[in-house]
Each structure stands twice: as structure tokens, then as C-alpha cells.
């Protein structure tokens, strides 16, 4: 039986650890950066999916939270989180029914994102049905991710104008999400500046067309520090809110994108050695069902991406000579590639995953640890919700 205040070396493996000292430090960095710039912080919760973590972020000064999908918003609202941006536009009977349940509670302030008039028509029908007006943010495609978003400039002005004619919603502002920056200081600063410029220019164009909007929301983990710096320097007074997410948790993928440092990654997988019968590798009890299967293949041109033809699926704490090169459903092979010594049967390793979002979404609980002790068992509120 697992209990709080027990040394985490006694936990059954595999399991997921959340280093609370690193979590708190990452929350402070995000909050201080936004506060110093004089901009509101609304952290995206898509990685940790935890109401417990989100409440710590609010206690530190965040103005609210962001989720990706409407089902996650309902899960968070049930846990007492009431000011929520839903980052992805949506349509459909089931999703609109979920919105109706959320909007029927007057305590809930849900902000919706649209990039088509059709999205807003569905939201507005719900709003009229519950007798309240709902705020909508117009998603702008600033380049990079190429997913949701109306093109900036005149196309955005056209959609914004049409949204003002729909009874039941009000156009609150514009929303953008940076993606695709090169992981260099120049690349990150350039992308932050470019996207902020596109969004602010579009906001000014919408206002010049006679449409009053209050909010300009930007942000992503790799670029948020640069965005805050530019806001502090007075370059983008239109920006009211930033919404980075992953940097509060961190993983190898975001480290490679400039979103966090290796030493600030707060989540690790605790795993045990199940076999040392081979000279070249040991077998662990954590596989695809624990790590997911993200090899970060999009970064395959990076130096040392492959070793012996294998990508890595995570980074072992304190053992850079080990290579997590092969995953199966319920186990993995970790290879020796240096002189660090062979692993022992039953030995435990902590591994920073490539993709913390996948790892956390697989598990029902995280074990919050501090100083080697389990301090908090943390429910993954959004696990399996809407996915």
C-alpha cells in the first residue's frame, strides 16, 4: 500500500514521479516572468492535466487556466477551477452539450476559441439557451504549427466583423500560438517577435475596422521568456495574456525545442531492472504502456540523435552512458554505450521521458516527491477525458 511520507524507493514500478521542488521552481519562473512584464499568465494544463497542479499555479498568481478541449474544461471545472480558456475550436452535438453543462453554472467563466463563423454559431446557440453571453477569442494562424487559425490581416478582420453580428457571444479578442522556432537564442527571439507582431498588427486592424476587442493572447513554452522580455520593453502593449504550458513540467522534446533545461524537467519515470542476462543491454519493466512511443523523429537531424541506428526514448538520470533504445509493450531494453558499469538486477532508474504529455496521460496518478519522500499523491484529472 502506498502512503504519503514514505520513501519513494519503496514504490512499485513503473510509476511516474513529479519532483515538487522543480515544479515549484518552474511555477515561480513562469509567474515571475509574466509579473515582471506586467502581463497576465494563463498556463496551459495539457501536459500535467492535474487540477492539483493547476491550483498551485493559480495560488502563485495565474489569472486562470487553459485546456485544449471542452471535455477537459468540464473535468477541471468539477474540481473547482472556474476561469478556463478552451484552446481548440469545436463543433458537434456532444461537445456543445458539454459546453452547456459548463455554461449553466454561473461560477464558470469559459472562454471559447473559434476560427470560423460556424464555430461561433454553435457556441451562441448554447449561450442563448442558458441565458448568458459567452466570450470568444478569434484564433489567428501566425505560422509554424499550421493547424487552427484564420489568416492574419484582412481575412481575420472579415471573420471578426461577422462574429460581432452573432447574438449570444461577444468577440473578446484574438489568440495565437507560436510554434516552429529554431532552438537558438536568435531563433527563439525571432519567432517570439514575429508572432507577437502578427497578432498585434491583426488586433489593431480589427479595432480600426470598428470592432472593439480587449484581449490579445499569445504564448508557447519555447518562446514565452522572449515574449515577456519584449512586452517588458514596451514593444507590444496590446498583449494582455500569455499561455505557455509545458515549461512547468518539461521533457526531452521541449528541451530540444528550447522550452526548458534538462535540469528543470520535473517528471521522471521510475523503473526497475528486470533482467541483466545480456552483455549489451538490460531489460526494464517500463515500455510503451509507460513511456508512450515518441522517439522525437522530427528532430532526427540533430547531432547524436541515433546510436547504433536506434533513437532514444528518454534520458537516464545520472547515467549518460545508458541508451533507452528499444521499447516493447511492457518492457524496454537499455543499452550500455560507455564505461559506466553494468546495471544490477532490481536496480532502479529515473528516466526523463521524451514526451511528458504522453506519459502523464497514460497514468492515473503522479507521485509528488520531495527529498526522496512521497509527499503527495496527485490525480491526473484529465486522463482519458475527451481522448
What is each PLM-predicted segment?
Residues 280, 284-387:
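C-terminal accessory subdomain/extension
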Residues 2-3, 22-53, 66:
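N-terminal glycine-rich anion-binding loops that anchor highly charged ligand groups
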Residues 223-309:
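Active-site loop ensemble at the mouth of alpha/beta enzyme cores that anchors a bound cofactor
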Residues 142-259:
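Active-site loop/helix belt of alpha/beta enzymes
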Residues 1-18:
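Generic N-terminal amphipathic, Lys/Arg-enriched alpha-helix
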Residues 23, 46, 76, 138, ...:
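Conserved, mostly hydrophobic/aromatic
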Residues 44-183:
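Active-site-proximal beta-alpha core segment in soluble small-molecule metabolic enzymes
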Amino acid at each position: 500500500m502506498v502512503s504519503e511520507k514514505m520513501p519513494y524507493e519503496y514504490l512499485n514500478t513503473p510509476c511516474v514521479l513529479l519532483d515538487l521542488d522543480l515544479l515549484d521552481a518552474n511555477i515561480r519562473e513562469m509567474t515571475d516572468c509574466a509579473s515582471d512584464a506586467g502581463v497576465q499568465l494563463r498556463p496551459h494544463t495539457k501536459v500535467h492535466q492535474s487540477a492539483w497542479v493547476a491550483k498551485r499555479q493559480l495560488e502563485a498568481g495565474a489569472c486562470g487556466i487553459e485546456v485544449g478541449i471542452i471535455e477537459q474544461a468540464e473535468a477541471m471545472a468539477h474540481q473547482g477551477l472556474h476561469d478556463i480558456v478552451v484552446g481548440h475550436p469545436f463543433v458537434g452535438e456532444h461537445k456543445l452539450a458539454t459546453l452547456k453543462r459548463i455554461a449553466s453554472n454561473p461560477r464558470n467563466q469559459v472562454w471559447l476559441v473559434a476560427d470560423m463563423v460556424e464555430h461561433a454559431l454553435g457556441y451562441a446557440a448554447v449561450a442563448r439557451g442558458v441565458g448568458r453571453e459567452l466570450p470568444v477569442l478569434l484564433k489567428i494562424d501566425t505560422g509554424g504549427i499550421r493547424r487552427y487559425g484564420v489568416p492574419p490581416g484582412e481575412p481575420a478582420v472579415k471573420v471578426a466583423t461577422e462574429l460581432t453580428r452573432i447574438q449570444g457571444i461577444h468577440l473578446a479578442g484574438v489568440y495565437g500560438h507560436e510554434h516552429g522556432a529554431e532552438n537558438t537564442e536568435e531563433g527563439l527571439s525571432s519567432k517570439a517577435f514575429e508572432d507577437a507582431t502578427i497578432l498585434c498588427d491583426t488586433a489593431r486592424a480589427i479595432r480600426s475596422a470598428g470592432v472593439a476587442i480587449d484581449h490579445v493572447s499569445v504564448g508557447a513554452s519555447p518562446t514565452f521568456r522572449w515574449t515577456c522580455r519584449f512586452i517588458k520593453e514596451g514593444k507590444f502593449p496590446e498583449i494582455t495574456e500569455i499561455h505557455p504550458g509545458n515549461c512547468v513540467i518539461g521533457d526531452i522534446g521541449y528541451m530540444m525545442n528550447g522550452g526548458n533545461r534538462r535540469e528543470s524537467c520535473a517528471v521522471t519515470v521510475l523503473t526497475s531492472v528486470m533482467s541483466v542476462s545480456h552483455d549489451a543491454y538490460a531489460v526494464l519493466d517500463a515500455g510503451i504502456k509507460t513511456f508512450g512511443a515518441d522517439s522525437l523523429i522530427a528532430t532526427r537531424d540533430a547531432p547524436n540523435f541515433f546510436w547504433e541506428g536506434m533513437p532514444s526514448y528518454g534520458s537516464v538520470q545520472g547515467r549518460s552512458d545508458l541508451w533507452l533504445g528499444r521499447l516493447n509493450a511492457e518492457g524496454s531494453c537499455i543499452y550500455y554505450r560507455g564505461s559506466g558499469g553494468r546495471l544490477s538486477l532490481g536496480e532502479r532508474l529515473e528516466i526523463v521521458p521524451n514526451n511528458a504529455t504522453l506519459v502523464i496521460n497514460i497514468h492515473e496518478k503522479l507521485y509528488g516527491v520531495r527529498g526522496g519522500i512521497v509527499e503527495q499523491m496527485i490525480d491526473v484529472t484529465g486522463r482519458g477525458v475527451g481522448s
